């Protein structure tokens, strides 16, 4: 017997604004039941003597200094552009066109 019912799946689908065909509700209920069972098994194993972690390996962020470095001049940036107009990249218009 599923821990989650067909009606609960339909309710969740409505909350998520998903249109689910009636014939998929039983299948999804069974799949969600498998997922819920797997999570329950993990909860059984993860008792209070095991500290919670967000990652299996202890990782720390390595930051580099935020230093200003020379970049391209506007002329260098536009040098290889296929089209330039008024000191800017010229690109085809895409908004407002009928497609």
From Swiss-Prot:
Its EC number is 6.3.5.-. Gene3D superfamilies: Glu-tRNAGln amidotransferase C subunit, N-terminal domain. The keyword Ligase applies. One of its GO terms (biological process) is glutaminyl-tRNAGln biosynthesis via transamidation. The keyword Ligase applies. It comes from the Bacteria. Pfam families: GatC. It catalyses: L-glutamyl-tRNA(Gln) + L-glutamine + ATP + H2O = L-glutaminyl-tRNA(Gln) + L-glutamate + ADP + phosphate + H(+); L-aspartyl-tRNA(Asn) + L-glutamine + ATP + H2O = L-asparaginyl-tRNA(Asn) + L-glutamate + ADP + phosphate + 2 H(+). InterPro entries: Asp/Glu-ADT_sf_sub_c, GatC. Signal peptide: none annotated. It is an enzyme of class 6 (ligase). NCBIfam families: gatC (TIGR00135). HAMAP family: GatC. Belongs to the GatC family. Heterotrimer of A, B and C subunits. This is Aspartyl/glutamyl-tRNA(Asn/Gln) amidotransferase subunit C. It comes from Thermobifida fusca (strain YX).
